[in-house]
Amino acid sequence: MPLELTQSRVQKIWVPVDHRPSLPRSCGPKLTNSPTVIVMVGLPARGKTYISKKLTRYLNWIGVPTKVFNVGEYRREAVKQYSSYNFFRPDNEEAMKVRKQCALAALRDVKSYLAKEGGQIAVFDATNTTRERRHMILHFAKENDFKAFFIESVCDDPTVVASNIMEVKISSPDYKDCNSAEAMDDFMKRISCYEASYQPLDPDKCDRDLSLIKVIDVGRRFLVNRVQDHIQSRIVYYLMNIHVQPRTIYLCRHGENEHNLQGRIGGDSGLSSRGKKFASALSKFVEEQNLKDLRVWTSQLKSTIQTAEALRLPYEQWKALNEIDAGVCEELTYEEIRDTYPEEYALREQDKYYYRYPTGESYQDLVQRLEPVIMELERQENVLVICHQAVLRCLLAYFLDKSAEEMPYLKCPLHTVLKLTPVAYGCRVESIYLNVESVCTHRERSEDAKKGPNPLMRRNSVTPLASPEPTKKPRINSFEEHVASTSAALPSCLPPEVPTQLPGQNMKGSRSSADSSRKH
């Protein structure tokens, strides 16, 4: 018998009046969007953590709740001080026990995140260089009805490896009290410890049944095997588009337009007199940057095109960069919306990211529309994007790893250029005001604003929702409790009790924490 449906007031989508019973967990892997464990593979300093963080940022941005579980963080939590590369020697049995238990502790948290906390994808960031370790992870995934997808980063270029070590590794907590030369020497010896037992993925023989992608020489070549579903295909597509070449991305809004002056949203009005001054100032700014082969992108709306015309440079128009569609509220002021559509006004104040204008769009829709723009931005070198407030917020949220709840309230003032420079594990942003006055179109978060739908409702949703959950500190409270709880699933990997410090070590260094609007 057909279910009775009702339309949700916020997202304007049809949902059953009564919640349907959840599917049994045994059906999990058959679902298109069932939980997935991404397993990183590769020697140290091959960019695994870079890929993990960047991929996680992308997946969260498109609305797939994702979290990284870095086993190195668990190791630093279990062993408070690091001595030397001897910790990673294959004949150091005490250290091997610690490392295996840290991996198990991370898998425990992976299970909790995917099964209880509404997560969709967990990135297991470790070397995972042996088939024995990868078999353990596959067994764990099968026992918990998770899919597994392997990403191996392979690089034999000594220049790239040395660059990775200098840029990232020597600044890690492990080498807090070492100079650069000492850190480099120790880390190279650490790599040698892994090389002795490294068993690369072999899709032609041993690993022909695994879903995997091998990223070779920082994206020069790729090898893909047995992609299982839509999400895995998107991961492959994303990894094939990113690069690590130095570049700068400039983001700005169009110059002030007539609707900005009137407080109206949407529409397609031209620049005001101050908006034209900004366009001239932007042209001068671009000349001063002296950028080689700068690409300029605009929307198909009048104000961005007028702004770009002042640059006297070729530019490309993207329909995807058009401002968010306000539907029946287009070209109204917020006061007019409040008076004409009081319920819609209140709903949007409560839930700005998920709220969809009648016959219009939501921020969630806008993110989906902008995904091709992000893909192309990742492929490019120097780019200037001239767009609109809601669009700029979405792009900025991607590069700065902002949550769905933060996105609609990011401050993106008129007549200001945001200069983005990709760095090791993130993006550095510089705000440059071009000294041309304008109206302020930013609206602060309402006190009535609330979080979106329950994250546990995402898994069987057609459009997964972004995760509002913050990154949690690794939890290594009781290895004994963890071993007992995983004994059935991992019978061959049961290590004994974990020491907090290895016998006979005189360790140095300590762990430190790292880390790295108007319209709508």
Swiss-Prot record:
<feature type="binding site">
    <location>
        <position position="334"/>
    </location>
    <ligand>
        <name>beta-D-fructose 2,6-bisphosphate</name>
    </ligand>
</feature>
<feature type="binding site">
    <location>
        <position position="363"/>
    </location>
    <ligand>
        <name>beta-D-fructose 2,6-bisphosphate</name>
    </ligand>
</feature>
<dbReference type="GO" id="GO:0005524">
    <property type="term" value="F:ATP binding"/>
</dbReference>
<feature type="active site" description="Tele-phosphohistidine intermediate">
    <location>
        <position position="254"/>
    </location>
</feature>
<feature type="binding site">
    <location>
        <position position="253"/>
    </location>
    <ligand>
        <name>beta-D-fructose 2,6-bisphosphate</name>
    </ligand>
</feature>
<feature type="binding site">
    <location>
        <begin position="164"/>
        <end position="169"/>
    </location>
    <ligand>
        <name>ATP</name>
    </ligand>
</feature>
<comment type="subunit">
    <text>Homodimer. Forms a heterodimer with PFKFB2.</text>
</comment>
<feature type="binding site">
    <location>
        <position position="266"/>
    </location>
    <ligand>
        <name>beta-D-fructose 2,6-bisphosphate</name>
    </ligand>
</feature>
<feature type="active site" description="Proton donor/acceptor">
    <location>
        <position position="323"/>
    </location>
</feature>
<feature type="binding site">
    <location>
        <position position="393"/>
    </location>
    <ligand>
        <name>beta-D-fructose 2,6-bisphosphate</name>
    </ligand>
</feature>
<keyword id="KW-0547">Nucleotide-binding</keyword>
<dbReference type="Pfam" id="PF00300">
    <property type="entry name" value="His_Phos_1"/>
</dbReference>
<dbReference type="GO" id="GO:0010001">
    <property type="term" value="P:glial cell differentiation"/>
</dbReference>
<dbReference type="InterPro" id="IPR027417">
    <property type="entry name" value="P-loop_NTPase"/>
</dbReference>
<dbReference type="GO" id="GO:0061744">
    <property type="term" value="P:motor behavior"/>
</dbReference>
<dbReference type="InterPro" id="IPR003094">
    <property type="entry name" value="6Pfruct_kin"/>
</dbReference>
<protein>
    <recommendedName>
        <fullName>6-phosphofructo-2-kinase/fructose-2,6-bisphosphatase 3</fullName>
        <ecNumber>2.7.1.105</ecNumber>
        <ecNumber>3.1.3.46</ecNumber>
    </recommendedName>
</protein>
<feature type="binding site">
    <location>
        <position position="389"/>
    </location>
    <ligand>
        <name>beta-D-fructose 2,6-bisphosphate</name>
    </ligand>
</feature>
<dbReference type="InterPro" id="IPR029033">
    <property type="entry name" value="His_PPase_superfam"/>
</dbReference>
<feature type="binding site">
    <location>
        <begin position="42"/>
        <end position="50"/>
    </location>
    <ligand>
        <name>ATP</name>
    </ligand>
</feature>
<keyword id="KW-0597">Phosphoprotein</keyword>
<dbReference type="GO" id="GO:0003873">
    <property type="term" value="F:6-phosphofructo-2-kinase activity"/>
</dbReference>
<feature type="compositionally biased region" description="Polar residues">
    <location>
        <begin position="502"/>
        <end position="520"/>
    </location>
</feature>
<feature type="binding site">
    <location>
        <position position="75"/>
    </location>
    <ligand>
        <name>beta-D-fructose 6-phosphate</name>
    </ligand>
</feature>
<keyword id="KW-0418">Kinase</keyword>
<keyword id="KW-0511">Multifunctional enzyme</keyword>
<feature type="binding site">
    <location>
        <begin position="389"/>
        <end position="393"/>
    </location>
    <ligand>
        <name>ATP</name>
    </ligand>
</feature>
<dbReference type="InterPro" id="IPR013078">
    <property type="entry name" value="His_Pase_superF_clade-1"/>
</dbReference>
<dbReference type="GO" id="GO:0006003">
    <property type="term" value="P:fructose 2,6-bisphosphate metabolic process"/>
</dbReference>
<feature type="active site">
    <location>
        <position position="155"/>
    </location>
</feature>
<feature type="region of interest" description="6-phosphofructo-2-kinase">
    <location>
        <begin position="1"/>
        <end position="245"/>
    </location>
</feature>
<feature type="site" description="Transition state stabilizer">
    <location>
        <position position="388"/>
    </location>
</feature>
<dbReference type="GO" id="GO:0005654">
    <property type="term" value="C:nucleoplasm"/>
</dbReference>
<keyword id="KW-0378">Hydrolase</keyword>
<comment type="function">
    <text>Catalyzes both the synthesis and degradation of fructose 2,6-bisphosphate.</text>
</comment>
<feature type="binding site">
    <location>
        <position position="133"/>
    </location>
    <ligand>
        <name>beta-D-fructose 6-phosphate</name>
    </ligand>
</feature>
<dbReference type="GO" id="GO:0006915">
    <property type="term" value="P:apoptotic process"/>
</dbReference>
<feature type="region of interest" description="Disordered">
    <location>
        <begin position="443"/>
        <end position="520"/>
    </location>
</feature>
<feature type="binding site">
    <location>
        <position position="194"/>
    </location>
    <ligand>
        <name>beta-D-fructose 6-phosphate</name>
    </ligand>
</feature>
<feature type="binding site">
    <location>
        <begin position="345"/>
        <end position="348"/>
    </location>
    <ligand>
        <name>ATP</name>
    </ligand>
</feature>
<dbReference type="GO" id="GO:0006000">
    <property type="term" value="P:fructose metabolic process"/>
</dbReference>
<feature type="binding site">
    <location>
        <position position="190"/>
    </location>
    <ligand>
        <name>beta-D-fructose 6-phosphate</name>
    </ligand>
</feature>
